[in-house]
Swiss-Prot record:
It comes from Escherichia coli (strain K12). One of its GO terms (biological process) is cellular response to acidic pH. One of its GO terms (molecular function) is protein homodimerization activity. This is Probable two-component-system connector protein AriR. Gene3D superfamilies: 1.20.5.5260. It comes from the Bacteria. The lineage of its organism: Bacteria, Pseudomonadati, Pseudomonadota, Gammaproteobacteria, Enterobacterales. Belongs to the AriR family. InterPro entries: AriR. Homodimer.
Length: 88
């Protein structure tokens, strides 16, 4: 996976990136989930915007059978949605 700095710089929503950057270890698991979503978007050549991050997280949520991982994905999705204006 890419370094956190690269991932945060790739996110077009700077407030969202700043939130995760400043969270430290408090959101370590959620940061890892977000990082994986951003990495997947970058590797596929998609724009790293909130809409695509949300779609990626929903896909991850739908395809995981691990209840604990699903909870972390859901928390990550909730954070991204909080930072997403009505631009969807």
């Amino acid at each position: 996976m890419l370094e956190d700095t690269t991932i945060h710089n790739a996110i077009t929503d700077k407030a969202l990136a700043s939130y995760f950057r400043s969270s430290g270890n408090l959101l370590e698991e959620e940061s890892a989930v977000l990082g994986q979503a951003v990495t997947n978007l970058m590797l596929s050549g998609d724009n790293v915007n909130n809409k695509n991050i949300i779609l990626s997280l929903i896909h991850s949520l739908e395809t995981t059978s691990d209840i604990l991982k699903a909870d972390v994905i859901r928390k990550t999705l909730e954070i991204v949605l909080r930072y997403t204006a009505d631009d969807m």
